[in-house]
């Protein structure tokens, strides 16, 4: 039984919204091949409204789905390798350091793939709710491991196990890391995750019982991730790498196809928080950057919208204001997330939250914010 509070959409459990149904495609680690990205673009164009939302965990959402589209959509997604197990649809939430394996950083893709395969192979873990998240960090951050339920931080040939964002005091060979993570997740299910609560931190006693079951004990909390990925070309390497940003986390089908066309054939796209898209390039960086900017994607941190994110706004029945139309930078808040209700869906971990409490009223940091619709538009 899924926890009552778990309302996260999937490919099989579509979420009703004002603009039609919403489906979420899980991309473990934020990794997606060129062929899969082309399939996602086709699904967005054929079944949805032609747009795609990048979530805070590096997954993607199709919006505006027509009634009755779920079965055909799921079948097509499965054919593209995007839905390996219907029973584990919501369980495959894995974040990963988005630059792993690039520029001399340690690779994580095989570890993420092994973890995903182990989740899908375990019937017990089908009970994990959509809010439960695994994280795999290469030591450079970017995986939001401090906010994860079960985390693995790789250090050379070893990996540290984290529970509810805290070290469990367990360091083990990388080859044994997946087994330890799965054991911790199974313990979480046994203790009530998926039935009474959706996150380990919400269990009675938090993560201590899970850590004990895993053979460890909770220690220091992991520090939050540092700076966001910078937009634009990264330091020289092979292949060249660009980071683009989806404005307010939303991509068009044309942007999907463009980013896919630039991808190096031996590489994968990596999706990250705040709508960041890491593209290992098959072409030179200068020409690619101009094409991305011309398509409307963010390509420079100097763009005033580079630190602005938003929920789905009036497309969601909970929203009380059109925050996507109102979203703009706020002085003194370099990273700001506009939310149409108190849930604050899609907020990056490092963003300040401005919440609409009515069509023209907002809270920023819990305090009334003097913003008028005319001023914000």
Where are these regions (language model features)?
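Intrinsic, low-complexity N-terminal interaction/targeting segments
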Residues: 1-16, 299
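Small-residue-enriched alpha-helical segments and adjacent helix-cap loops
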Residues: 2, 21-162, 174-175, 179, ...
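Short, flexible, solvent-exposed loop/turn segments with mixed acidic/basic and small polar residues
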Residues: 12-18, 48-54, 191-192, 229-239, ...
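Short, structured segments at the rim of ligand-binding sites
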Residues: 34-37, 61, 198-209
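Terminal amphipathic helices with adjacent charged low-complexity linkers/tails
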Residues: 69, 193, 201-226
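Internal alpha/beta scaffold segment
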Residues: 165-196
